[in-house]
A protein has these predicted regions:
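Active-site loop/lid in soluble adenylation, ligation, and acyl-transfer enzymes
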Residues: 1-81, 214, 222-223, 286-290, ...
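A structural preference for short, hydrophobic beta-strand core positions in alpha/beta folds
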Residues: 10, 133-135, 255, 440-444
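Short acidic loop-to-helix transition motifs that present clustered carboxylates
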Residues: 13-16, 260-263, 443-450
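Extended, low-hydrophobicity, polar/charged segments
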Residues: 50-58, 83-99, 104-377, 381
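C-terminal, non-catalytic macromolecule-binding modules
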Residues: 205, 375-404, 486
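Generic long, charged, amphipathic alpha-helical segments
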Residues: 397-451
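C-terminal structured "cap/appendage" subdomains that terminate the fold
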Residues: 428-486
Length: 486
């Protein structure tokens, strides 16, 4: 609100046509909850609301004089996740604060983006989170730029890539692998098929040939939007599916089934190779520097050694591998480091992606129609709770930062049967309420130790204990984060 945003509330049940018009119905695919009403009309449960806010802007902003402005909501979102997990971190129904900025040009979008960047920094700083801001994939959202707020956590599902020597930070999904392999200058040898019984994995093949996994080139068969494709990369590397998806401009990318692999390779799984393969082959750029490498022969129990680039066709070469810890930083050349993180917020420069598809335009100073420039900004409320709980706890329970604690303090009566203690507690509680403090009064007829344990478990920042010292006008104050008594 302090940065000029206005709060609205959009519906969760949305006509499917809204997402078809923007092209995102296909992009979300099976991750979108879909249903029909009694008239057989198609609806979806909103996974995100860029389209609706763009439509609202079409009714509000007609002239360049109406810009810039920013709208936001706090609304429930729905995504049919394949594998919901990690408690509140990846779920099918979640609450999100999403905001959308509208500007007349890129310079205006940059300014709005910077304001939201500052606002988010303030929010996560107030939550006392240990976080990193990392470059990220735009994914189904699309647009010009994406950054994520990653709360560092041992239970985080994302890998946050950092650097020992500079402030480089990236999501693993888009982190560039710096190619440090020197081109092989040796003479190209003739291909030779080798019988390799009872081996299938890279490690087994390496053991058979007495070489390192990096000396091999592995072939992975995938299905991209229903079409089979192959990716080849160094044997000691893993495919980065985000990079592969972007290269192919695919909506869905998944490993091919064993049946599909056998269909295109005419061999069991584990013996695929690029030589003679009749599907598109996409090659990681590090393979281009290799010579006389070993690949699967597309024949069960066989491999081919001394394979070179001239021996097979490549549809395209690109950076396709996942980065590994210790790889070279793209910015400064120092070793990269890994952390785990929980994505608690994100920022997107959408540009004119949704304006172009939905017809969101305004009249400029020359009375000509121009597309509106949009930004999108989200915070996952439950994810924030999960991240704070992970970063602020001990063996006795939670230690909520004061900004988001369910209560500012708890008043604990040592003996609920002691009238003096009860009276003092009720007076203190009434005073706190009058001053606007949200206080918990624990007047249960329980042993003091039980009450103390419960307050620690809940994680209330301060505990005010009223016991025998009441008769002398004394109380005990304990700060949860420090355990010190006053």
């Amino acid at each position: 609100d302090k940065h000029g945003a206005q709060e609205l509330l959009m519906p969760a049940l949305i006509p499917e046509d809204v997402y078809i018009s923007s092209g995102r119905r296909e992009a979300f695919g099976s991750n979108m909850f879909a249903l029909k009403d009694r008239y057989n009309k198609n609806y979806v449960l909103g996974p995100t609301h860029e389209e609706l806010f763009a439509m609202a802007a079409m009714m509000d902003g007609k002239s360049y004089k109406d810009f810039p402005y920013n709208l936001y909501q706090i609304q429930t979102k729905y995504r049919d996740e394949t594998r919901p997990r990690y408690g509140l971190i990846r779920v099918r129904e979640f609450i999100m604060k999403d905001a959308y900025s509208f500007d007349t040009d890129l310079a205006g979008l940059d300014e709005s983006y910077a304001k939201m960047y500052d606002a988010y920094n303030c929010i996560f700083d107030r939550l006392k989170l240990n976080y990193k801001i990392v470059k990220a994939d735009t994914g189904a959202m699309g647009g010009l730029l994406s950054e994520e707020y990653q709360a560092l956590s041992t239970i985080g599902e994302d890998t946050v890539v950092g650097c020992e020597g500079c402030d480089f930070a990236s999501n693993m999904e888009i982190c560039e692998v710096v190619d440090t392999i020197e081109a092989d200058s040796s003479e190209e040898l003739a291909m030779e098929k080798v019988y390799t019984p009872n081996v299938g994995t890279i490690e087994e093949v390496a053991g058979f040939f007495g070489k390192e996994p990096s000396d091999f080139v592995k072939t992975l068969i995938y299905k991209a939007d229903g079409n089979l494709v192959a990716f080849i990369l160094p044997g000691d590397r893993e495919l980065n599916e985000t990079k592969a998806t972007k290269l192919l401009k695919a909506v869905e990318l998944e490993m091919a089934s064993a049946e599909d692999v056998e269909k295109v390779t005419h061999a069991r799984v584990g013996f695929a190779g690029p030589v003679g393969l009749e599907i598109p082959v996409y090659m990681d750029r590090m393979v281009a520097k290799k010579k006389n490498f070993i690949v699967g022969a597309n024949e069960s129990d066989h491999h081919i050694k001394n394979v070179n680039l001239k021996d097979f066709e490549v549809a395209e070469t690109a950076d396709l591998c996942e980065v590994k810890e210790g790889d070279i930083c793209p910015s400064c050349g120092k070793p990269l480091t890994f952390d785990h993180g929980i994505e608690v917020g994100n920022l997107f420069k959408l540009g004119t992606k949704y304006s172009d598809s939905l017809g969101l335009e305004y009249l400029d100073q020359n009375n000509k129609l121009q597309p509106v420039w949009m930004g999108s900004y989200g915070i996952g409320l439950e994810r924030c709770m999960a991240a704070v709980a992970d970063q602020y706890h001990d063996d006795n329970g939670l230690i909520w930062p004061e900004e988001i604690a369910p209560f500012k303090a708890a008043i604990v009566i040592v003996s609920a049967k002691d009238e003096a203690q009860k009276e003092a507690a009720e007076k203190l509680y009434a005073y706190a309420q009058e001053k606007g403090y949200d206080i918990l009064l624990d007047d249960r007829n329980e042993r003091p130790g039980v009450k103390f344990k419960d307050m620690e478990l809940i994680g209330i920042p301060y505990r005010i204990t009223l016991g025998k010292g009441v008769k002398d006008g004394k109380a005990e104050l304990v700060k949860r984060s420090e355990g010190q008594k006053q």
